[in-house]
Amino acid sequence: MKTILSSETMNIPDGVTIKVNAKVIEVEGPRGKLVRDFKHLNLDFDLITDENGKKKLKIDAWFGSRKTSAAIRTALSHVENLITGVTKGFRYKMRFVYADFPINASITNDNKSIEIRNFLGEKKVRKVDLLDGVSIIRSEKVKDEVVLDGNDIELVSRSCALINQKCHVKKKDIRKFLDGIYVSEKGAVVVEE
């Protein structure tokens, strides 16, 4: 069954400006600017003003199936992530896990890449270049922890995945050999009191 019109709106917080140009959403805030392309979705994006004068983003789906109606909520979640990115930012913390051989990691290239040494006692140096807009630092408080910061949640989480995949244990039982670098905490760069 097709629904004639399904739509949802979301509030735009103060200090954030949103521009809509043919399914390309541009969000600008105190931490920078993010652009997201929704051309693959059969949705209409509009900026509206409610009776109180507050700006809102409205997403419509005309004659959509259940999948199209579900895509509305997905698009709203993506825009919410963009707003969170330009206001608070995203911070992922990764911990080094090892049993015998301590993992040595050095951050190079102006906090844009990491080199991993002595993983499972191997001599090979594993180098991971982070995606654009993501920076990495060593944690001062916690031993064997790195912190990844960025505005785009997808770039930060994909950079974490690249680091995690570089430390993949091969030809051993992964239930026994739990060595690696794993995400331990996800949060915002700007923490509200």
From Swiss-Prot:
One GO cellular component term: cytosolic large ribosomal subunit
Keywords: Ribonucleoprotein, Ribosomal protein
Pfam families: Ribosomal_L6
Keyword Ribonucleoprotein: yes
InterPro entries according to UniProt: Ribosomal_uL6-like, Ribosomal_uL6-like_a/b-dom_sf, Ribosomal_uL6_a/b-dom, Ribosomal_uL6_CS2
Source organism superkingdom: Eukaryota
SUPFAM superfamilies given in the database record: Ribosomal protein L6
Cystine bridges: none
PROSITE patterns: RIBOSOMAL_L6_2
Biological process terms in GO annotation: cytoplasmic translation
Keyword Membrane attached: no
A GO molecular function held by the record: rRNA binding
Family: Belongs to the universal ribosomal protein uL6 family.
This protein's name: Large ribosomal subunit protein uL6
Source species: Pisum sativum
